[in-house]
Amino acid sequence: MFKAPPLLGFRAFPYLGPMTIDNDYIAEKFSLLSKLMDIHGENSFKTKSYSVAAFTLEKLPSSIAELPSAKMTSIRGIGDAIGKKIAEILETGELRLLQQYISQTPPGVIQMLNIKGLGPKKIATIWKEMEIESIGELLYACQENRLLLYKGFGEKTQQNVGAAIEFFLQNQGSHLYAEIEPYASRIDTQLQQQFSTEQSSLTGDFRRQLEIIDHLQWVTTITPADATAFFTTAGFEEIQPDPSSASSATASAAGSSRFKSPEGIVLEFIHTHPDTFFSTLFQTSCSGEFLEAFNETTHWDPHHPHPSEEALFAAANLPFIPAYRREQRIVLDRATQHPLTPDIETTDIRAIIHSHSKYSDGSNTLAEMAAACIEKGYEYLVISDHSKSAGYANGLKEDRIREQHAEIDELNHRLAPFVIFKSIESDILNDGALDYSPDILSTFDLVIASVHSNLKMTEEKAMMRLLNAINNPYTTILGHLTGRLLLSRPGYPVDHKTIIDACVKNKVAIELNAHPRRLDMDWRWISYALDQGALISIDPDAHSVEGYNSIRHGVLAARKAGLTPDRNLSSFGREQFKTYLAERKKSKGI
């Protein structure tokens, strides 16, 4: 679920009752007002007057509230107009003018003021020219090299802004699985080394490989006292266990303990006895829905000792279900009828579909993208740079498409049997049309259709755009179905079943965009898609050769829904892929 980080650094909330309205409080109001006015392009003289007033108040040796009105307005940098604003704040705790600007500014834009290296002028460019309204979107834009296309943003600035955003997000309480995984692994390794005779295992949401992790959990036979000594010595803060958490409900009599790392990450330890270790591990590795269904189906005894989770499932007369599949009741229902099919692995991915080169907003040349594919053992590469409406991403106009296709032809001749397929990530326009005429679209081997603009729309509008694009015979793959950016931007509302059904009817594959900030389509809809006969395509949306590594995160998400290689387009071999494209075009008469 999308969860916007709170606004930090500014007290921009309504007045809620008695508080100390001191010089610093008033100065913060004026400082924020000055910056917001700057962002909105107001007269620089007016904006500067509020920043000067803020500076004056911060340095004032006495409380402004204790000064007579005449003396207050005589202070250099205050004056009559500012004096009236100070009186308003002293009386109400608020400033109406500031509230007006706050109401006219997206919360995420205000939040950007907390990012080191971003001032009002740059934020105005980000908001008004790049049409970015959250720091998560901005981080994604940094990763796609989009800032480089705008005045005042060089490569170094882009790197610094990206690093500052990552630091900020790390302290907001929720983390992408991809970002917290290395940290969790390091802590786990240290535990194994320090307590080599004890049993410990990561559990909870992390073990189920959910895309967003609020805190890390372990099941362990380490005693609470030993855990406390280990972590407090390392500079962690001991905090009270959360009695409402699911882990607390399933914890054994040995109890639980929680710590906060210097980075602000919460670690929870569920202490258990050796004979109930695997029972506790199992319980804490299930969603509430799955565990309830398991209890109803098996009537198992959680206090009975088991030497492994596999043994626990065997005792319940069930095939083993790995932790990442323990989400939905339907998984257990199907497992009671027949063994689960082997899930897709990263080794099953035979190609890179959906990648960007220097022709649009990628970091590498076509040759470099192809060479990296060959080095990693992939059989082919689908280059899908941005289309002409994507001015923010240096989208390709018709003449540059012809230039790119000529280079692809030359590379294919030189790199055979490796193949670069000609593609485009075509913007889905406001009316659902694709970005080029049929004559141009026919020059591509395949077309990925995606929404990139005007994301704030009703479900009716979103469905119209998507369905029109799906009905276009040239659309081969529907890209990032909802446009979401995890922890940054919710997706536009869609009727998933209708979209999936339309894709099946029109022989359009549905992308599982593997970028850790997207993972879109959501894995929770893949099971329905597979039941309807849909073809999924795990694609990295790579903007550099390093971006190929995102494939793994798409695979982790797909495994949660039981996707198999035969139902994933990027698992098709080179010749199978060629045949698929040819047969699809023939069926569409294009």
Kindly label every feature range from the protein language model.
Residues 209-357, 365-377, 382-383, 388-418, ...:
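Charged catalytic cores and adjacent phosphate/nucleic-acid-binding surfaces used
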Residues 423-426, 553:
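Active-site catalytic microenvironments in core metabolic enzymes, especially phosphate/sugar-handling
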Residues 14-15:
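Short, positively charged and aromatic/hydrophobic N-terminal segments
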Residues 34, 46-216, 220-257, 264, ...:
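Accessory alpha-helical DNA-binding modules that contact the DNA backbone or grooves
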Residues 19-42:
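Charged, compositionally biased N-terminal leader segments and the immediate start
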